[in-house]
Amino acid sequence: MTDWSRRRFLQTGAALGIAGTLPQTTTEVSAASPTLEKFVQPLPIPSVREPDGQRDGADAYEIAVTEFTQQLHPDLPETTVWGFDGSYPGPTIEADAGSPVHVRFDNSGLPSEHLFPVDDRLGGTTAENHPGYDGPVPEVRTVTHFHGLELDPANDGQSDMWTSPGGVEGPRFDSAWQELPMEQGRTTSTYHDHTLGITRLNAYAGLLGLYSITTDAERELGLPSGDYDIPLLLQDKEFNDDGSLHYPEEFVSAFLGDTAVVNGAVWPYVEVEPRRYRFRILNGANHRSFDLQLESESGSGVPTMYQFAPGHGFLESVVPIGPNGDLDSLLLTPFERGELVVDFSDHAGETLTLANGADMGPELTDLVEFRVSDPSTPPEDASADPTSLSLPTPASYDESDARVTREMTLGTEVRNGLITHTLNGHVFGDEDAPVYPQLGATEIWELQNESGGRHPIHLHLVTFRVIGRGPDGTQPPDPNELGPKDTVRVDPGERVRILVTFEGYTGQFPWHCHMLEHEDNKMMIPFVVENPVADYANEENVVDATGLTDAVGDWRNETLETEVLLEVIDQWRSGDEVA
């Protein structure tokens, strides 16, 4: 066992310790799903969505959000789900970097009654949970967030920007169209529901899909493509005997299903050739972490998984994962991603399983079966050897660039019989946004987890670099964390340090735990990005001579940083409106 593996084992064990400490009402206890035979249906691949046309020079998509039935296993009756364009998961949206996309999600086809019971004890389910809003809060509401996209607030799909099938609009709803500039590096991620108080229900019902942004640098790597580029969207669910999805009637803080669902199919198999494949793996579960490794049916050796990206950009170097790798397994908390190349060349005729070693709740060890063909002639494979990939150099970063270091202590307390999450001793959401980063500023956030369970922390708007973890935050990140990320695992008793630059847009953005039950139970709070240059703009939002004089005066009085003064000067010289 490598040093990384020992640390991973201890982290996993600590994260699971919460099960023995929480009140009985916080975990899901139910009758098991019907017994279903594994690996009797092929893995479905989500279709790639073609644009419906153009809108203001952007590819335009009009996507219906509806309720329908879908066969998730041959031995189950059809299951009622929600989805995008009549499919669960939704179709994949692909874009080139710099090519804008506009999307309109139309939920008018959803029923007025939710697929699952809505617990109105949770914030967001009644009007009193929406400050400054006294309108109706329908049971069925949706809003779609493109996880990991750099967007202005109006297009970010934030939790109080929902709409209902009957046309009721949430307090911060802005437009039916979401305008996505796609002006960022290569990305593999998900679009998913993000509605205040019912995200866990809407996502569990099926409201998520994949999107990707491709760059020329990615194409030049020679990664497996076409039929050899396979997405794996991992989830866990429970079923009733009639095929319907089971979810608890009252809120539980940790839902763990007993059945693996991958790309909308229960325990599927994949027929692969003895050659290299690319896998884009997303943990789309409500709460469950997946600790992934390959296992051989015969007990023989397994191919190494070579991770080259964590969802954004690229890692500093390719990380081999497996018995002889730098890591024994790939640990993904909810909504983390891992992008891999696996070479099946030496395993013709064998059967392999993607297995889960994270021992959480109902045992869920097997996920997907790979059946490697044994052709008489080896298949052609022009893709690059993953051991010799020359990855683009990630953007440099330096801790000394940080203007501010912020302590973010995560804890819990019990209120009204519910586990409630706290930030620096205050219940999430009981106060206004505690942080106001300046546009362009780099900060260090120290995430100290004093609660009893794991938290995958996600920041909207930005990507960040993990710079330390462990009990005091001084241990190096895992090798497959050395790249741009938008979600980071913070285990109990651990301090995780991230370096983040707030750039692109000003305004209000949420950061939250991405365990959906935690998120719905108020473990979400905004940060507000402010542009200090705006303080020196006139009524036309332009820095004039008066504003420049004021800025110089503040700098001389040592109340304005030199960096901000230089930005004010540049803004005055340009004559442009302040962003």
From Swiss-Prot:
The temperature dependence reads: Optimum temperature is 45-50 degrees Celsius. Highly thermostable.
EC top class, as a word: oxidoreductase
The primary location reported for this protein is secreted
Instruction: Indicate yes or no for the key word Secreted.
Output: yes
Question: How does changing the pH alter activity?
Answer: Optimum pH is 6.0 for the oxidation of 2,2'-azino-di-(3-ethylbenzothiazoline)-6-sulfonic acid and 8.4 for the oxidation of syringaldazine.
Tell me one GO molecular function of this protein: copper ion binding
User: Which Pfam families does this chain map to?
Assistant: Cu-oxidase_2 (PF07731), Cu-oxidase_3 (PF07732)
Q: Where in the cell is it found?
A: Secreted
Q: How is it modified after translation?
A: Exported by the Tat system.
Q: How is its activity regulated?
A: Inhibited by 1 mM NaN(3), 10 mM thiourea, 10 mM 1,10-phenanthroline, 0.1 mM DL-dithiothreitol (DTT) and 1 mM L-cysteine. The inhibition by DTT and L-cysteine is likely caused by reduction of the oxidized substrate and not by inhibition of the enzyme.
Annotated Cu cation 1 binding lies at: H145, H458
- Residues annotated as glycosylated: N449, N557
List of residues binding Cu cation 3: H194, H460, H512
Query: Which keywords does UniProt give here?
Result: Copper, Glycoprotein, Metal-binding, Oxidoreductase, Plasmid, Repeat, Secreted, Signal
Q: Which cofactor does it need?
A: Cu(2+)
Q: What does the function comment of this entry state? A: Catalyzes the oxidation of a wide variety of organic substrates, including bilirubin, syringaldazine (SGZ), 2,2'-azino-di-(3-ethylbenzothiazoline)-6-sulfonic acid (ABTS) and dimethoxyphenol (DMP). No oxidation of Fe(2+) or guaiacol.
Query: Belongs to which family?
Result: Belongs to the multicopper oxidase family.
Protein name listed in UniProt: Laccase
In its UniProt entry, the species of origin is given as Haloferax volcanii (strain ATCC 29605 / DSM 3757 / JCM 8879 / NBRC 14742 / NCIMB 2012 / VKM B-1768 / DS2) (Halobacterium volcanii)
